[in-house]
């Protein structure tokens, strides 16, 4: 019905429109326009918009009027509202969509937890970024310091002044001392208070090295590691903050390994003796730990007036086992409460502390150990750990029983210390590996771990093959220990560099001596560990043990290991040479030579032939290096003689060997062009003819240089002539000169005078004394240029020395120049020209300068 009415309305509207269109007459003023319905609608909307723009609603006008009355700018308010931002409310974030308070609170809780987690993540990221930035800055600073240190390695030693270096005097120490400072050690250390650590170390170590060389020269005993340790202690360096190992601990270890603190056990190999020494060092350290623990807990220790070793162990156990109840050695009435059996604890800690006799007494007195374990322990103590194969097998079987008991009834059914003790006596690699796998928490410190391993080590090279074949046991060797320790990077031991000496300490304990030294030498820093490394090498080489500890994978020979140490010591000594301290250079160079010679044995000549040869070769090479320095000859040889008054006599006491060395050094200097030093050495050993020959060679070259215009040629020639005359003077008063030497000296003196005559001719020519120069030329032998004398054959000129012959071409040029400047009154000038021409014609094979032949041709 409604649709019919709507359609009728549209129909009426269309009819009315048609009538209007028919009534409208066309106008000439306005052209007819055709529009469809869509166009009409668009035009109508546009027209309506124009009318609405100019018509403000009454509400808008009223609002503007109200704002104006209150003093508010409507336009400014509109602009502000455009930039206004609505903030979300709590209800917006947590819409109340839940139907109960509990659900709503649960939703709020979850959202709060999510927000907290997100904030924590942001804090973690920010903290991580800050930490990484700090680490990068520290690494950058460290790399910069290491780079600067590598650029100025020689600055590790301060500059020194040369001091009178006569034998027995103190020449140029690392720290220059003023004349007012006393030479007592106490006052010297006072003057070094403000010096850097590396300078202090270098000074006190150098004093020990000087004393070492002096003692070894005289064949006196010398505890080198002990004195190095004492020198380090005297510095009172406090570098132990946050560090478990310092240099003093390393020196104490070396004392123990070298046997300076206790007698070395006989009947074992040198390598096994080092193992025992390292183990004794750990035992001594544990003894100090026990005393510190007792002093920290005096009430619980209840030591009283007892000072025996066993009483100390029991006092320590009272503290350690205080939570276990009454201990057997303190129990009064065992029937009331069964005490804790500490037999195995006492034995273990007695051995751990080095109280072997007390450990044996406990084992023999206890019912749980006296029958089976006591004999095994006695043999282990007596043999130094090298028990018989049957003993090792028995101990290994007991280990198997204990392990099976633990698997069946639980590991708490027996004392773990009992298992460790039987494993130590067995020395079985299989048992040790199982303990490392199943009971890795038994060892509280790395010292405890290494002591256990060192106690298990057997001297495999000393006859372990029979043990393996007969009983099927594979003994634990030092190589096994080294291979296990080397699985971990150095940073694992040093805590990423925070405790830098732990790694070399572990290497030394595992008898990896050379790797320990090399690692320390590469430690650049203010602590001066590279200086310590050099002196550790000196100590180990002196005891002839460095080659025993090349480390796993570095099977070096004795010479290779000692050569590594020698190179390090030599490089360190060259730093003193760089600063002009010849005295300390000599001391360290002597140690470098001794290193390749086998250490202490090289001083007494007890090392093998090859080592002695290597030692002599290096010593001569290093002494030659010192001789080449300024004042080196005076330092080694003294004011006169061939070394009796200088330092050379200390290391080459035999006069024949000393003279032979100096002659060889002079020959090397001559080949290197160091003629002054070569002449001085030849003069010192009485080789006057050789010295004169060197002077004649240099004088011949100097004359040629003088003719060619060298500015210092004249002073050079005068100095050589004076040196030659000085040698001839010394020769006259020398007591022991052979007939052959006298003949050779006379020959060289003749050559010197001939060269001196040639030199005088050049001087006369420069002074324009041409006639005098010509007369001197006519007097020269071998040339026979005097026109009044008969001609000679060319063979006579061959008899002249090579030094004389070298000067002849320049001499003939000067002679021709002089002839051109002198009037020929009697034909003698022309006669001399003819003589010169004939002389040149007979020596055309010598390839003399072309301008000489041209000059003689022009003169005719």
Swiss-Prot record:
Protein name per its UniProtKB record: Nuclear pore complex protein NUP93B
Keywords: mRNA transport, Nuclear pore complex, Nucleus, Protein transport, Translocation, Transport
Annotated disulfide bonds: none
UniProt family annotation: Belongs to the nucleoporin interacting component (NIC) family.
Species in which this protein is naturally found: Arabidopsis thaliana (Mouse-ear cress)
Cellular-component GO terms for this entry: nuclear envelope; nuclear pore
ATP-binding as UniProt keyword: no
The keyword Protein transport is annotated on this UniProt entry: yes
Pfam families the record matches: Nic96
Main location: nucleus
